[in-house]
C-alpha cells in the first residue's frame, strides 16, 4: 500500500516539476502527435484512435487516449488535421488534455523529393484532483491512512493554455526524415509553487524521426505491396531523452514490428507489435516488455490502435516511403 502511495505521489510531483508528453510505441498510428507536417500526407482522408496503458504492474499508473483526423487538398498542395489527446496519471490524480489543429504545405522540390512544412495550434489543459492525493503526514505506520493532511490546497487546481507547434518532413520514394517541435511557447501548466516561484512551463519537445522502405513484393489492383521499413525515433523533452530503433513489416493483410527503446540513462524496453488490415481498416496491438530496473514491479505497457484510410483512386506522386503511417 505504502509503495503504491509513494509511487503516485512521486509521479505527481514529477509531472508537476517537469512534465513530458506521452510517446506512443505505435508512433506511426498517431502521426500528428509525432509531427504536424504529417497533415495531409496520405492520398486520402484518414483517421485513427489509440489507447495506451503504461506500467500495467501498477494500478492505473498512466493511461493515454488519442484520436486524429487528417486529409489532403492536392490542388492547394495542402493538408489539415485535428488531434485530440487525454492523459490520466495516478488513476485520475493528474489529467492532461490537448486539442489541436494542424496545417501543412507541400513543396515539391523535384520529381523525387518533397518538403512538408507544418504548423499546429491548440489548447493544453491540466487538472489536479486534490482530494485523491495522499500525503506522507496522513499515513500511520500501523493503521495506514488515518490523518488529515496539513498540506494547503492550491487556489487553482486547473489551467488551460495556448499550445503552438511546428514540423518539417522530407519525403521521397527511398527515405523520409522529419523534425517536430512541440510546445514552442512552453505552455504554462503551473498549479503548485516551489519556493514562491511558479513551476516552469511545459518544455519544448524535440522529435527527430526517419526511415526507409524496402519493397518485398509489388502490389497490384486491390492489393497493397509487401514491404519492410527500418526506422528510428528520437525524442528529447527537458531532461528526458529516448531513442527507438527497429523495423515495421507489412506482408499482405498482416503487419508486425519490433523496436528497442533506450532512455540514455538505461535500456528501457523491447516493443513488439502485431496487427492486421481489412479493407480500409487497420488494427495494431503492441506490448512494451520492460527491461530496466522497473521490470519486476512496473510490468509492461499495453497499447492498441485502430486506423482507417478512406477509399481513394490514386496515390500522391511522392509519399511511397510513408506507407507504414497509412
Feature-to-residue mapping (PLM):
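Sec-dependent signal peptide recognition
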Residues: 2-10
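N-terminal signal peptide c-region/cleavage motif recognized by signal peptidases
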Residues: 14-16
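Subset of outer-membrane beta-barrel
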Residues: 20-326
Amino acid at each position: 500500500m505504502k509503495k503504491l502511495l509513494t509511487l503516485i505521489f512521486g509521479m505527481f510531483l514529477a509531472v508537476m516539476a517537469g512534465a513530458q508528453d506521452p510517446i506512443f510505441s505505435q508512433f506511426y498510428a498517431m502521426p500528428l502527435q509525432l509531427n504536424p507536417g504529417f497533415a495531409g500526407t496520405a492520398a486520402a482522408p484518414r483517421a485513427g484512435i489509440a489507447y495506451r496503458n503504461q506500467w500495467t504492474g501498477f494500478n492505473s499508473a498512466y493511461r493515454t487516449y488519442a484520436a486524429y483526423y487528417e486529409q489532403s487538398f492536392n490542388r492547394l498542395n495542402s493538408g489539415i488535421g485535428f488531434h485530440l489527446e487525454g492523459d490520466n496519471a495516478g488513476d485520475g490524480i493528474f489529467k492532461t488534455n490537448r486539442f489541436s489543429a494542424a496545417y501543412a504545405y507541400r513543396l515539391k522540390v523535384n520529381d523525387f523529393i518533397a518538403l512538408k512544412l507544418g504548423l499546429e495550434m491548440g489548447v493544453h489543459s491540466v487538472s489536479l484532483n486534490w482530494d485523491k492525493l495522499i500525503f506522507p503526514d496522513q499515513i500511520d505506520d500501523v493503521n495506514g491512512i488515518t490523518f488529515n493532511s496539513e498540506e494547503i490546497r492550491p487556489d487553482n487546481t486547473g489551467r488551460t493554455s495556448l499550445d503552438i507547434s511546428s514540423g518539417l518532413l522530407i519525403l521521397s520514394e527511398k527515405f523520409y526524415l522529419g523534425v517536430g517541435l512541440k510546445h514552442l511557447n512552453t505552455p504554462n501548466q503551473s498549479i503548485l509553487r516551489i519556493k514562491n516561484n511558479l513551476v516552469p512551463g511545459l518544455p519544448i519537445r524535440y522529435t527527430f524521426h526517419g526511415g526507409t522502405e524496402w519493397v518485398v513484393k509489388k502490389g497490384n489492383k486491390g492489393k497493397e505491396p509487401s514491404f519492410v521499413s527500418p526506422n528510428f525515433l528520437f525524442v528529447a523533452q527537458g531532461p528526458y531523452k529516448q531513442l527507438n530503433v527497429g523495423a515495421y513489416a507489412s506482408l499482405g493483410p498482416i503487419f508486425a514490428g519490433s523496436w528497442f527503446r533506450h532512455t540514455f540513462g538505461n535500456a528501457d524496453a523491447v516493443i513488439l507489435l502485431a496487427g492486421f488490415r481489412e479493407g480500409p481498416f487497420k488494427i495494431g496491438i503492441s506490448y512494451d516488455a520492460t527491461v530496466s530496473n522497473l521490470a519486476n514491479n512496473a510490468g509492461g505497457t499495453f497499447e492498441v490502435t485502430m486506423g482507417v484510410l478512406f477509399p481513394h483512386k490514386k496515390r500522391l506522386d511522392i509519399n511511397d516511403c510513408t506507407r507504414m503511417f497509412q
